[in-house]
Each structure stands twice: as structure tokens, then as C-alpha cells.
């Protein structure tokens, strides 16, 4: 019975349109690694709330430096996998150029983190001001699913704006699974944005 199942599942007709053949051994972007990317980005954007909670004003420069270096390495590999997925030429013919492009895009994304933090600060303020039950900005950052979904969206949107394929959708779908809030990375959302509760909210790619 097991052998028959293996044989049937291995027939080309059974996986037509469902099989992705990796180019030059490069895997697809990994949701598990992208989870680490998001956690690292959050630890940089909201220091002390995510990642190392013992961070203080004397050690913040060190911790952010370490996290940014790790973020750059992980993100470069994931962007490379995304570029290989979207490449028509195949990674065997353009691996070096794609790797350089992946590193360039990862560095460009990291350069956007200060801007993202400024915008997310307005989102936290909007959530706090809009909810009379909120006790502090810290509570909003730690507890509100909207901030998790919005931070994923802000990260994914910047990656999409840089032309990174596939990864932005994975990142927003991770937040969708976690919070029930579905924000397409292509949506144009300004500052001071919040969602009260949010379960079942859908914001599409054409939203402005």
C-alpha cells in the first residue's frame, strides 16, 4: 500500500502545477527563517520589548549592531531564494549576480529601519489614543495583535517596494495566520494607523 502511494504521488501528472523544482540547489524562502527575520526586525524596531529584554541605554548600540548583522545575513539568504524563485534564467547562470543583488536589497532594507521605527511609533500612538482601555504604549506594543500585523505589513511593504519577490506575501500571511488580520503588502497605508481588535479585517493590494 505504501509503495503504491509513493508511486502514484511520484507520477508527473499527479503533481502538475504543484511541483517547484529548485534551481541550482537553492531552496524556496523559508517561513521558519522568515519568522526569525521578523523577530530580529521587531527587536530592532522595539528594543527591549522583543528579543533581549535586558537591553539598556548603555548596551543598546551593541545589541542593535549584533541584531542588524544577523538580520542582514538571514535576509540576504532569504532574498536570494526569492530572487531564484522569480528568476527565469536559473540560478546556475546568474548565482553570483543574484547573490550581490540580494545583499544590496538586504542592506537597502536595513537602511529603511529608522524610517519604519518612526512610522510604527505613530501607529502605537494611534492605538493607544484610540483605545480607552490601553494603559500604556508598552502594553500596546506587547499585547495588541494589530501592532504585530502592522509591523509585519510595514516590513513586507518596504521589501515589496524594493522589488523583492514572494517574501512580502509570506510575511503578511504569517501575520494573518497569527492575528486574523490580512493586510496585503502592496496596500498604501500612511502613519498613525491602527486597527481595533482586527480579527477578520482584510486590506487589499489596491487600498490607499
What are these regions (language model features)?
Residues 1-173:
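Terminal amphipathic alpha-helical/low-complexity segments used for targeting or macromolecular assembly
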Residues 174-208:
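Structural signal for interior beta-strand "rungs" in well-ordered beta-sheet cores
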